[in-house]
């Protein structure tokens, strides 16, 4: 039985690795972006549903992300594309229906909260203050970490470039043999340092999600006494708020990662230029190394300036979303168009459920497919 468990574990690792290449989040984003794009176009374009175009976009996920075809990914692709296109159809049909449901939900909530409008507004205001207190240190810490790790990256790469300059002066007669290892190592150091930079900065988004859950739960408890007979409707609105706030956290993570990748893309070509000039004369190579150091300084400084303020921008966005909830629940809200966030949340929940169900079935199939090891009886000694 132990051997069977080991084989199963290894199989699961292989499946998980393959599945990670195409995630539920990626699929949901493709479907949602396509839906939003059609919704924003002219009516004639919306009526002409481009099923083939959506199918192409979904298939492109597999072409771009998966290096080799295996049973799991092939099965996933065959089942996913029809599911996602059908889901897109339902989005278009459910949009107006959900819009009306949310309108009625907010009407009932406002009517129930109206006698306590001032207290409700004050409670939400208190929650915004608590949220600001919780998030403030994270924004400052993110800026500090960006500065610290960007400076560390700059120092390490600059020191490497300086070692190349020293080697250049000491080995004028044999430049290519002396500097080729340094040039190769420089590119590796760029990749390594950028990955370390991402590794230090992107976990902030996950920590922020925990703070968001805490804050939304605090808000739910503080408003519960005023919404005793409409608690489910209040919970639904708070779920929508949490979804929007966590989406901002995911976008923060993606922006940090994208900026780090962009930094890498700007640094690597310069390192390759230096390597390509190892056969040139000493003067040309010295010029390239000087340009490399200057380029490192500029690009790292640009990264620091771009990413440093992200924390403050994120905090403002979350506070604005809580303020919008206060306005929605207030007596003078008017018509509020916020059903799309609930529609997107429902879409992502369905895609996550699809992936979970498929993964569970795949694991069960593997469990059945792995045979019990047969133990050969050992003859007793006579």
Swiss-Prot record:
Signal sequence residues: 1-20
Keyword vocabulary terms for this entry: Chylomicron, HDL, Lipid transport, Phosphoprotein, Repeat, Secreted, Signal, Transport
Presence of the UniProt keyword Lipid metabolism in the record: no
Region listing for 13 X 22 AA approximate tandem repeats, in residue ranges: 33-330
Main location: secreted
Record's GO cellular component terms: chylomicron; extracellular vesicle; high-density lipoprotein particle; low-density lipoprotein particle; very-low-density lipoprotein particle
Family matches, as InterPro entries: ApoA_E, Apolipoprotein_A1/A4/E
UniProt free text on domains: Nine of the thirteen 22-amino acid tandem repeats (each 22-mer is actually a tandem array of two, A and B, related 11-mers) occurring in this sequence are predicted to be highly alpha-helical, and many of these helices are amphipathic. They may therefore serve as lipid-binding domains with lecithin:cholesterol acyltransferase (LCAT) activating abilities.
Protein name in UniProt: Apolipoprotein A-IV
């Amino acid at each position: 039985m132990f051997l069977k468990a080991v084989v199963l574990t290894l199989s699961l690792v292989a499946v998980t690795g393959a599945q990670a290449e195409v995630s539920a989040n990626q699929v949901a984003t493709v479907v949602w972006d396509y839906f939003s794009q059609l919704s924003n176009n002219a009516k004639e374009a919306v009526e002409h549903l481009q099923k083939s175009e959506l199918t192409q976009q979904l298939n492109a996920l597999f072409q771009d992300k998966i290096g080799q075809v295996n049973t799991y990914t092939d099965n996933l692709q065959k089942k996913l594309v029809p599911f996602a296109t059908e889901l897109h159809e339902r989005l278009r049909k459910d949009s107006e229906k959900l819009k009306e449901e949310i309108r009625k939900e907010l009407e009932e909530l406002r009517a129930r909260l109206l006698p306590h409008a001032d207290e409700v507004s004050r409670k939400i205001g208190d929650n915004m203050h608590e949220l600001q207190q919780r998030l403030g240190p994270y924004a400052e810490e993110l800026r500090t970490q960006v500065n610290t790790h960007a400076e560390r990256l700059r120092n390490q790469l600059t020191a490497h470039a300086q070692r190349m300059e020293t080697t250049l002066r000491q080995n004028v007669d044999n430049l290519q043999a002396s500097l080729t290892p340094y040039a190769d190592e420089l590119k590796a150091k760029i990749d390594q340092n950028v990955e370390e930079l991402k590794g230090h900065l992107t976990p902030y988004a996950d920590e922020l999600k925990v703070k968001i859950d805490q804050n939304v739960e605090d808000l739910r408890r503080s408003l519960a006494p005023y919404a005793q007979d409409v608690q489910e409707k209040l919970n639904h609105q708070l779920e929508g708020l949490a979804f929007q706030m966590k989406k901002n956290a995911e976008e923060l993570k993606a922006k940090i990662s994208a900026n780090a990748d962009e930094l890498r893309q700007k640094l690597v070509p310069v390192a390759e230029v230096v390597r390509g000039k190892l056969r040139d004369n000493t003067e040309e190579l010295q010029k390239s190394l000087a340009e490399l150091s200057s380029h490192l300084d500029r690009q790292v400084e640009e990264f620091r300036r771009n990413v440093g303020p992200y924390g403050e921008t994120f905090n403002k966005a979350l506070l604005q979303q809580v303020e919008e909830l206060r306005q929605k629940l207030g007596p003078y809200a008017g018509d509020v168009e916020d059903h799309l966030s609930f529609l997107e949340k429902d879409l992502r929940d369905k895609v996550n459920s699809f992936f979970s169900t498929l993964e569970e079935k795949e694991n069960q199939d593997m469990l059945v497919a792995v045979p019990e090891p047969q133990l050969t009886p050992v003859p007793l000694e006579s």
